[in-house]
Design a protein with these regions (language model features):
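Bacterial extracytoplasmic/cell-wall-associated proteins, especially those involved in peptidoglycan
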Residues: 5-6, 10-206
Length: 206
């Protein structure tokens, strides 16, 4: 409702809930909820808090601590992972790749953050001009995580970060079969070989 939207963007309310304007989406855990049409705004947010605490149980909080992240940081990384791949089996691998980059103080270089910075998720190809956008969400020019999530991640997305796959990958490129999955690489030479395969397939597709 409009009342819920107003409350969401109220800075005093955000602070009271323990969030900032950019981390507020982390409150919400996607699920099918049964709510009544006459539920008050306060009751709605109390319900969301209850569901958030239920999801972020002691086990998940311990997992977040073990990987050196707050729940908000996990949520932020999960939002990027889910924009990179729809493949649930691949999500922990992508999460592991970004965590490797964070540990090496490398920019994440995540294209979805550029789309978010430009507020254009319909962009099909990111150009060098797009990479110059002046935004804290530009993970090509800034290291570390962006200030907050670029979407509300699913439970699977969050769990893929908490249970990320350990490997040496720091690069990925869309597969040349256009399956929506990726080829991964631990060095730039292998990454460029993967990229050439993809570009060749892309040019042949035109």
């Amino acid at each position: 409702s409009a009342e819920i939207a107003r409350q969401l963007f109220d800075s005093a309310f955000q602070t009271e809930m323990g969030y900032t304007p950019v981390t507020m989406p982390c409150l919400f855990i996607p699920e099918t909820y049964q709510v009544y049409w006459d539920m008050s705004v306060d009751d709605f947010f109390k319900r969301m808090q209850t569901e958030h605490k239920r999801f972020w149980n002691d086990e998940r909080l311990a997992q977040a601590t073990a990987i050196g992240m707050t729940p908000e940081e996990v949520c932020t990384l999960a939002s990027i992972v889910e924009e990179e791949t729809n493949n649930n089996e691949e999500k922990p691998i992508v999460a592991g790749l970004y965590i490797n980059r964070l540990h090496q103080d490398m920019p994440l270089q995540a294209d979805p953050t550029i789309k978010f910075a430009l507020q254009d998720f319909g962009l099909r190809r990111i150009t060098n001009e797009h990479l110059k956008v002046n935004s804290p969400y530009n993970t090509y020019i800034n290291t570390g995580l962006p200030p907050g999530p670029i979407r509300i991640p699913s439970k699977k997305g969050i769990d893929s970060v908490l249970n990320y796959t350990k490997h040496n990958y720091i690069y990925m490129c869309a597969k040349e079969d256009f399956s929506g999955t990726h080829n991964f690489a631990s060095n730039y030479a292998d990454h460029m070989a993967n990229a050439r395969k993809y570009w060749k397939a892309l040019n042949e597709r035109k």
